[in-house]
Regions:
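A ligand-binding cleft/hinge motif common to bilobed small-molecule-binding domains
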Residues: 7-43, 152-156, 167-169
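Surface-exposed patches in mature extracellular/periplasmic domains of secreted proteins
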Residues: 39-40, 76-81, 144-149
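Soluble non-cytosolic domains of exported or imported proteins
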Residues: 1-4, 12, 19, 52-60, ...
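Periplasmic-binding protein-like
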Residues: 22, 26-63, 66-95, 99, ...
Length: 169
């Protein structure tokens, strides 16, 4: 169920291959020189943020913030900071000094095991999804709290109200 467990099983010969998203696969191969990525893609996927159907106001606010972040180049900068040989590490997202977080805190449910989307750097969850969520919250006037959980628990956490939204690579 977890990328690191699958990679360990592969290295131990318990499985013949691991099918995982491209960017986490690259992170695993970078740390395990005895592994390789095949040239043929298994499938193309799209990613999304999940928000409870009962929170249409939050969905609309997120969609608006995402459009603004696309238009001003912030989302591209976030992605480029984690993916790309020429840009990796060069455009880290920093909350604006004057960011207003007076509306409270939004909680993001994630599974921090899919570098570069979300992963631990020391004791802090970072990555594309974490930075994107932080940028959205900055636009909307909220602080961000990130809750790491099992991947299969994210939708339940969001639909039950334990988390305001979910994002997990």
């Amino acid at each position: 169920n977890k990328g690191p467990d699958a990679v360990q099983a592969l290295k131990q010969g318990k499985v013949d291959c691991v099918i995982i998203d491209e960017q986490p696969a690259k992170a695993f191969v970078e740390k395990n020189s005895d592994l390789k990525i095949l040239d043929d893609a298994f499938a193309d996927e799209e990613y999304a943020i999940c928000i409870s159907k009962d929170r249409s106001d939050l969905t609309e606010a997120f969609n608006g913030a995402i459009e603004e972040l696309k238009a001003d180049g912030t989302l591209d900068d976030i992605v480029n900071n984690y993916i790309g040989d020429d840009t990796k590490g060069k455009t880290p997202y920093e909350s604006p000094a004057d960011a207003d977080h007076s509306k409270g805190t939004l909680k993001m449910a994630t599974n921090a095991a899919f570098e570069p989307y979300e992963y631990y750097d020391g004791d802090k969850i970072t990555g594309i999804d974490a930075d994107m969520a932080r940028a959205i919250c900055d636009k909307l006037g909220y602080d961000l709290e990130i809750d790491d959980m099992e991947f299969d628990s994210i939708i339940t956490a969001v639909s039950s109200g334990k988390a305001d939204f979910g994002a997990a690579g």
